[in-house]
Structures are given as C-alpha cells and as structure tokens.
C-alpha cells in the first residue's frame, strides 16, 4: 500500500510526543501518523486508534505490529471513542476526509476518475450508502446536506439536478 501522510512532520511536532505518553489517533487510516507516534513511544506509552474502514484497520494492525505492541485499534467511528478510552491522554489527532486509497480503489465508490457503483461508505457495515442518499432522499434533504455539510452555495440547483437525473447508479453519472 503506497500512501503518503499529509502534514506528517507538522502533526508529530505539534503533538510533542512524550515517550511515556498516551495518544489517540481518531482517524487511523493507513497508520502513517500513528506509526510515527508509536516509534516515539516507550513501553509505558500507549496509542489508541480508531477507524471505521475495515480495510484500513486490517492493514494498519499489521503495519503497527511491526513497530510495537503498545497500541489498540478500534474498528469504529471516532465519535465512539469515549466508550473505549477512559484514561487521560497527552495528545489526540484527526486527519479528516477520505484517504487516497479510498479514492484510488474504484470499487469503494469514491472515485472522481473511474466509473463504479455509487457507494461511498467508509464503514461497509453501514446500510446507508451514497446510492440511497442520491436516489431516495427528498429535494429538501439533499439541499440541507449539500449546504450544511458541503457548504455548497449552489445547493438548490445541484439538488434539482440530482432529482432530475435519477436514477443515478455510478460515480461518473
């Protein structure tokens, strides 16, 4: 897996990793940032990591295991972290958004360049996918999503275009 972590040095510098500290990576991804944190931790230090992408969890578990054993990965969204971590931490990091592997793997349904079934689920255990949102949500719901989450000023015209183009089955439609 070839993946270049964004702002890696700046993130590690900003965390000011203490060898015996406890850290959380809320968006593990392919463990670029977590790997660097784990390299700086001694036996007393610990890393908790969260990701909802099963493929990322599998890959990162193997990658981090080659660096150390003082970590725990949870296959869940970071919004659930308080259910799993009840200890003080010295630092926490998030790298929000899709990762390049998610965009590159056509069958994930995130691609801007390759045609694939419209999916866009980071967690394949979730029933709701992009196909259902695009094809079943009301005009009002689409406008709300585009405006509130995408900060899209043309939300109304885009939502109208989506409604008029239904059904939409693939990423390039």
Name each region found by the language model:
Residues 1-173:
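S-adenosyl-L-methionine-dependent methyltransferase catalytic core, i.e., the SAM/SAH-binding region
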């Amino acid at each position: 897996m070839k993946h270049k972590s964004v702002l890696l040095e700046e993130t590690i510098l900003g965390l000011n990793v203490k060898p015996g500290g406890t850290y959380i990576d809320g968006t593990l991804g392919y463990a670029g940032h977590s790997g660097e944190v784990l390299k700086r931790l001694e036996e007393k230090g610990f890393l908790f990591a969260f990701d909802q992408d099963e493929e990322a969890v599998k890959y990162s578990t193997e990658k981090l295991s080659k660096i150390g054993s003082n970590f725990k990965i949870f296959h869940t969204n970071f919004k659930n972290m308080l259910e799993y971590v009840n200890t003080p931490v010295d630092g926490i990091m998030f790298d929000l958004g899709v990762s390049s592997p998610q965009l590159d793997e056509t069958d994930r349904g995130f691609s801007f360049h390759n045609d694939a079934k419209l999916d866009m689920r980071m967690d394949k255990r979730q029933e709701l996918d992009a196909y259902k949102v695009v094809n079943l949500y009301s005009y009002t719901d689409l406008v709300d999503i585009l405006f509130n989450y995408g900060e899209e000023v043309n939300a109304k015209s885009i939502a109208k275009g989506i409604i008029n183009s239904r059904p939409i089955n693939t990423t390039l439609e």
